[in-house]
Amino acid sequence: MFKSVVYSILAASLANAGTIPLGKLADVDKIGTQKDIFPFLGGAGPYYSFPGDYGISRDLPEGCEMKQLQMVGRHGERYPTVSLAKTIKSTWYKLSNYTRQFNGSLSFLNDDYEFFIRDDDDLEMETTFANSDDVLNPYTGEMNAKRHARDFLAQYGYMVENQTSFAVFTSNSKRCHDTAQYFIDGLGDQFNITLQTVSEAESAGANTLSACNSCPAWDYDANDDIVNEYDTTYLDDIAKRLNKENKGLNLTSTDASTLFSWCAFEVNAKGYSDVCDIFTKDELVHYSYYQDLHTYYHEGPGYDIIKSVGSNLFNASVKLLKQSEIQDQKVWLSFTHDTDILNFLTTAGIIDDKNNLTAEYVPFMGNTFHRSWYVPQGARVYTEKFQCSNDTYVRYVINDAVVPIETCSTGPGFSCEINDFYDYAEKRVAGTDFLKVCNVSSVSNSTELTFYWDWNTTHYNASLLRQ
């Protein structure tokens, strides 16, 4: 796979020789060799398949026919945000102004190291062939989206064989929009696809893919008292180790934490990162669980507002399923952010909400929530509705793996019988009220998600935002 990707990129590079980011010769031996750490990067690193696939075949069960397909995807690999880049640059400033020879795990900085953020215009943006730090980088968001499109055709191409004209939906974040466009490009020119760009501003209210932005009641400090109980001495230990190896360096625990982000986003930009080799395996586990803990209590089941936020998109998904027989469009593809996907999965009950994560230690038995498993860069959640004989079923496929509903999985391929699913969905949203809980009326008059139904007359074309 890696070789085929490299050959494809090299072919493209010959046509764009004037803009090739050549990198260094040593890169060839390093690029694509760090996939084992992707699960520990909290979703900031490149895409990888869901590890807990339970051995269930993703293929449509024998004798069944797909009736509807929905997909909610995250934008592809990107550069850091403006705010995070500021923090990374602060640590880089300390390192770049160190006047002595580096020792230990920082010794790579002696070898003409090139900082991966070359242009501030790249911040917040998708990594592409044009802005990647190395021509051989297989992890660009552009390549990921195009590869996803080819995988989609291989898995579900029959769903669009007789429907060459359809809409694809994206938030108006530029990186989400770019991912959607690269995906469309990857499908080929045999389709007439209308890209609907839906606003993610708070004024969009309920008519959005990004309900969290329309929720002024969202408290970003909620549950900090729980998360802050987590032991972060591993960060102190990293800083102490690096400072001991390099006299006078004076890195802090904040710098140590920043290095994890640096590692992830550098891999996105150049295909590998020497910074990632700074950490021990134990330190990666500690960092990864902190990301899980923080997400669980800020964007997942541990924050009581999330089920209501996620219900906005989940209710629309269920409505589409119920209308599959009368809707001309059978495939519904949408691109947005990781938070929106996490909110959706929380409401859907795919993320375990029966056992709250503990901040007292790193749990290994019974812990099924890992942020990076669900929302790596380029994450994708498919909702399949298929018919077998006279019965119809629903199941979820997350990042290439079938993930059954725990209490409803007795159907073919560990799916949920359709009426049982509707009962399940009704119970999941019982007591939720996105408009009321989020106080949406204070920022918008829009009280319903309608873009899946009125796109052909409204023609959504929100201005793109660098966020």
From Swiss-Prot:
**The protein's Enzyme Commission number:** 3.1.3.2
Q: Which UniProt keywords apply?
A: Glycoprotein, Hydrolase, Secreted, Signal
Note the superkingdom of the native organism: Eukaryota
Q: Which GO terms describe its molecular function?
A: acid phosphatase activity; nucleoside triphosphate diphosphatase activity; ribonucleoside triphosphate phosphatase activity
Q: Where in the cell is it found?
A: Secreted
Gene3D superfamilies given for it? Phosphoglycerate mutase-like (3.40.50.1240)
Record field: catalytic activity: a phosphate monoester + H2O = an alcohol + phosphate
User: Catalytic center at which residues?
Assistant: 75, 338
> Can you quote a single GO CC term?
extracellular region
Its principal location?
secreted
Q: What class of enzyme is it?
A: hydrolase
GO BP terms: namely:
cellular response to phosphate starvation; phosphate-containing compound metabolic process; regulation of cell size
A Pfam family cross-referenced in the UniProt record is His_Phos_2
Maturation and modification: Glycosylated during secretion across the membrane.
Q: Where is the signal peptide?
A: 1-17
The protein's matches in SUPFAM superfamilies, at most eight in alphabetical order, are given as: Phosphoglycerate mutase-like
InterPro entries in alphabetical order: Acid_Pase_AS, His_Pase_clade-2, His_PPase_superfam, Histidine_acid_Pase_euk
* Note from the entry: Present with 1110 molecules/cell in log phase SD medium.
Report the sequence similarity comment from the record. Answer: Belongs to the histidine acid phosphatase family.
What does the protein in this record do? Answer: Partially mediates extracellular nucleotide derived phosphate hydrolysis along with NPP1 and NPP2.
Name this protein carries in UniProt: Repressible acid phosphatase
Lineage runs: Eukaryota, Fungi, Dikarya, Ascomycota, Saccharomycotina
